[in-house]
Regions:
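Catalytic-loop region of hydrolases
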Residues: 21-88, 92
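Short, surface-exposed "cap/lid" segments of acyl-processing enzymes
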Residues: 70-78, 82-125
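Short alpha-helix in the alpha/beta-hydrolase fold that links the catalytic acid
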Residues: 194, 328-329, 342-353
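C-terminal catalytic histidine-bearing segment of alpha/beta-hydrolase fold enzymes
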Residues: 305, 311-312, 340, 347-348, ...
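Short beta-strand/loop motif that positions the catalytic acidic residue
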Residues: 326, 331-338
Length: 400
């Protein structure tokens, strides 16, 4: 258990794993996707590189697959398939794990660029992990990311899952009929959006268990709470949600209608350049007080600009507008001290699920504080990791 917990602790704090390569299988460094020549031509899914091994003994296959962009147009996206040395051809793996990653900003923080610390959690459990980069990373790095547009991101993850299953079969891998759907923060939101899309569009996609932590399931309510509380734990996420929904949901606001200086003059460099990490961006913003970087008009919920943004956020509200399958099995996790994603998101999701007849919902609400350097949102991810490992091991029948 200590070994697996270490992987999750590293994972959710977003630390990178150093790559070491197998002499027989791999090049001398991470394979790098082609991100400078525009979108790839449409085609079938394919493995982009020879398999390589990371320092924590993960075998990695990067792949490209067909999906859609945030406007619904065809596009090729990228992701990674990872497995421990306990998985091999000819012997069925214990199942698949769809891992939906948390908030990232720097280009090399996505799975296909080598950020695979999270995927180490599958080591020792006999699982094959599938991770989408999301639009705006990997082979679509030259585009803005569709940050926290949950239903769209879920579509890209389901497409990645389907493509990876096909590619794995072609390579001679097999697995038991078990599928875990896991994510924290933005990944928690995406995980619940995967549940929603599966219920509405993919009746044959059976999820064994979903484990979602601290996701923004009700973004309009989150927006209203930030306005009332006047602070947000990670300013970069607030800015990114506004940029993303304004662009991809056609809200039509200028940057000057959304942001104050110095953020206004540094959007391209700080956020869209993909040069910086989340902590670095938050440090450059320099304040948790949203009135220091968001315009008064957007903090006035009666203004035309605020109403337009709220309507866009409402269009992606996961706490309404779909009918969950009663057979879903879900764990929801949150800390009451979280000021990055308010705990009301998880309570509202729990109420929504149970009101629609979903009985197997394990609600995990904990009191986990932050520190002077680490927000409660990140500190709580450690407990989420431990509970996730316990849940997966119990379902698979693996002792601690």
């Amino acid at each position: 258990m200590r070994r697996s917990f270490f992987f999750f602790a590293v994972l959710f704090l977003g630390l990178s794993v150093v790559c070491s390569c197998s002499k027989e299988e791999v090049p001398n460094s991470y394979p790098q996707p082609d991100v400078n020549t525009g979108d790839l031509p449409m085609g079938d899914a394919y493995i982009t590189d020879s398999a390589y091994l990371t320092a924590n003994h993960l075998k990695v296959y990067n792949f490209v697959y067909p999906s859609v962009d945030p406007y619904g147009e065809p596009v090729m996206l990228s992701g990674s398939i990872t497995m421990g040395d306990d998985v091999s051809r000819g012997v069925p793996a214990n199942g698949l794990l769809l891992y939906n990653h948390f908030t990232v900003y720097r280009a090399d923080e996505c799975p296909s660029r080598g950020e695979l610390s999270t995927q180490g959690m599958a080591t020792g459990m006999g699982l094959i992990t599938i991770s989408a980069d999301y639009y705006g990373f990997g082979v679509t790095e030259h585009h803005h990311q569709a940050y926290c547009i949950s239903l769209y991101n879920a579509q890209t993850c389901i497409d990645a899952l389907m493509a990876a299953k096909q590619l794995l079969g072609q390579m001679g891998y097999s697995w038991d009929d078990v599928l875990f759907n896991v994510g924290y923060s933005q990944g928690g939101q995406t995980s619940m959006a995967v549940v929603a899309l599966a219920a509405e569009r993919y009746p044959d996609l059976n999820i064994t268990y979903t484990i979602a932590g601290a996701g923004s399931y009700d973004l309009p309510e989150t927006y209203r709470q930030f306005v009332d509380a006047t602070i947000a734990g990670m300013p970069s996420t607030v800015i990114s949600v506004m940029l993303s929904y304004n662009e991809f949901k056609n809200v039509g606001l200028s940057r000057g209608e959304m942001f104050l200086e110095p953020v206004l003059s540094h959007i391209d460099e700080w956020i869209l350049s993909k040069k910086y990490t989340r902590p670095e961006i938050d440090a450059m913003v320099g304040s948790l007080v949203i009135g220091d970087y968001i315009t008064p008009a957007l903090l006035d919920t009666t203004s035309a600009s605020s109403r337009a943004l709220t309507a866009a956020l409402e269009s992606d509200n996961l706490c309404k507008g779909w009918t969950p399958r009663g057979s879903e099995r879900i764990m929801l996790f949150h800390s009451v001290r979280d000021i990055t994603v308010p705990v009301s998101n998880t309570q509202r999701m729990y109420d929504f699920l149970t009101s629609h007849g979903v009985q197997d919902v394990d609600l995990q609400i904990h009191d986990i504080e932050g520190t002077s350097t680490t927000p409660a949102h990140e500190n709580a991810s450690l407990m989420f990791g431990l509970l996730t490992l316990q849940k997966i091991r119990a379902i698979l029948g693996i002792s601690a």
